[in-house]
Each structure stands twice: as C-alpha cells, then as structure tokens.
Amino acid sequence: MPVKAGINGFGRIGRIVLRNALLHGDIDVVAVNDPFIDLEYMVYMFKYDSVHGRFKGSVEAKDGKLYVEGKPIHVFAEKDPANIPWGSVGAEYIVESTGVFTTTEKASAHLKGVCKKVIISAPSADAPMFVCGVNLDAYDSKYKVISNASCTTNCLAPLAKVIHDKFGIVQGLMTSVHATTATQKTVDGPSNKDWLGGRSVGNNIIPSSTGAAKAVGKVIPSLNGKLNGLAFRVPTVDVSVVDLVVRLEKPASYDEIKQAIKEASETTHKGILGYTEEKVVSTDFTGNDNSSIFDRDAGIALNKTFVKLISWYDNEWGYSRRCCDLLGYAAKVDGAL
C-alpha cells in the first residue's frame, strides 16, 4: 500500500512534487494545503505549466476537492501548519514546500495525530539533510523532520561523491549558473537583504550567493571545509548547470574521470547521476529525472590533478522527483511501506 502524503504549499515545487508523486508507486497524495490559492485556481495552475507543459491527465474541482486522474485530493487553506487537519485524511508524510517553515521547530508544527514525518523541500539550518545517492544510509527513523537539501546540492553532491571516492578531492570551487526562481523580480524592485536580488531578472546576469557547496560537507563529512561556491542567476525559466573545479588527490586523466562517472551513472548512481555524450543545451534537460547529468564534452582539464567538470540539472523537475524518492525511502525504513 502506498504511503499517504500531504503537500503544504502549492507553488512551483509543490505542484511538480504532485506531478511526480502520481508517477511514484509508493506515494498517495491525499491532501494539499495552500491558504493563498483557491480550489478553482489550483486546477488551473496544475493543468497548465509554462515550463513542463499541460498536464496530460484529467484535473477538475468537484465536491470541494481537487480531482486528478479521477482521484480525490482534499484541499485545505490553513496558514498555520499546526491547524492543518492532516489527521482527518490520514496523511502520515508531509512535503513542506512553502519555503517558509524550513527549521525543525517550524516544520514540527505538522507533527500531530497520524503525521509521522516532514520532508522540507529546501535547505534547513538545523534539520538533518539527505541527498539521494549520497548519504541515505545515514537516515534514521528517529528523525521526524528532514531536509531534501537544495536543488544545487542535489546536483553537486552525487558528482562530488563519485570523484571523491575514486580520486579524492583536495579542494574545490563551484559555480552554479541558475535559472530564474519565484523570489526574483521581473523589474527592478526593493530587496533589502539582497540588493542584487532586487534587479530585474529578464535582462541581467545576477551574481548571487549559494550554500550548496558548503552543504556538501554536511552530507559528505570528509569534504567538510573543502568546497565553496557562488551562483549567477540568468534569464532562463528552468534548468541550471554546475561548474565544479577541483584539485585531485590522485592524478587522473580527463578520460579516466569521464569513465568513472559513466560507470557510476550506470551502476551505483543510476537514476541519480546521468551522463551525456550529446551536443546539448539547457532546454534539452527540461523534465529530466536525474539530480545531475554530467556533460562529457563540456569539461576540461589543466593537468591530471586540476579539472573542471560540468553537470546539468532541472532544478524543478529533478529536485521534485528526489523529494518523492526521499519520502519513499524514509517510509520504507520507518516500516510505513
């Protein structure tokens, strides 16, 4: 029997998590909560998507519920997570995708009645972070609130793990060339905490900070303090790319590095770390399920210990798929599946 799940926040990630959950045999989404989107608008937003296209199945509002493929999904509109009646519909696992309740304390408001676990679809300051293909073996059922880290960490960490396990990473710097997200401005506007973040997204390349590289040290402890990074926000609607420059402990040719990544993509990291030999651009990865897709021909080496590696990721779709995978994995370990 699939585990019953709820989604709090029906924004970009919430909606795409639902699309992915419908393809995931272990998850049955029984409820969605969003105080800012009424039911009829939920139908519209789920049906039409400017990036991922129109939903191919049926979606409608009926009897106060959201019906997707003929299946009813309860809809709530509570601002306070503590007031969401997850228990009334039997939702045991909650995807917290508002981007607001990202600490253990705030996300724990969901934990009452039958609710067993909260998966935060964002980095968290204090909740344990888990990245599929990297550190799931560290998961323990005692954790009630966990984080799926960020989309960029999900791209970087599997690549870094393969390289570190095979050749050893002495140190590295990452640049993420990141597509537009909902927090950015269409025209110049106020952004007191991040002045650059207030500049218009449509006609600028915007330098930005990211904690993705440092977060790798949390999921791969042996890399703690060895990686750092920054980001550029660019005027594209989806799909981002990681540029990782590393100094290797064990000398290796670029061909040897490519082969190690290719082998991992076909074995230990299949479905997580992809590998492409095609001549590709960003839109070619829209809807790609992998967390990270290594671009064989885009990287370069200065010598056998200093290399630049390029890996793509659909920061919406691939990340949302990992939210579902993490939920399913946790449920199995917890004995809920």
UniProtKB/Swiss-Prot annotation:
Q: From the UniProt record, list the reaction(s) this protein catalyses.
A: D-glyceraldehyde 3-phosphate + phosphate + NAD(+) = (2R)-3-phospho-glyceroyl phosphate + NADH + H(+)
Q: Subunit structure, briefly?
A: Homotetramer.
**Could you name the active-site residues?**
151 (nucleophile)
Identify the keywords attached in UniProt to this record, alphabetized: Cytoplasm, Glycolysis, NAD, Oxidoreductase
Protein name from the UniProt record: Glyceraldehyde-3-phosphate dehydrogenase
**InterPro entries, alphabetized:** GlycerAld/Erythrose_P_DH (IPR020831), GlycerAld_3-P_DH_AS (IPR020830), GlycerAld_3-P_DH_cat (IPR020829), GlycerAld_3-P_DH_NAD(P)-bd (IPR020828), Glyceraldehyde-3-P_DH_1 (IPR006424), NAD(P)-bd_dom_sf (IPR036291)
Q: Check the UniProt entry and state the signal peptide residues, or none.
A: none
Q: Which Pfam families match?
A: Gp_dh_C, Gp_dh_N
Cross-referenced NCBIfam families: GAPDH-I (TIGR01534)
Q: From which organism does this entry originate?
A: Phanerodontia chrysosporium
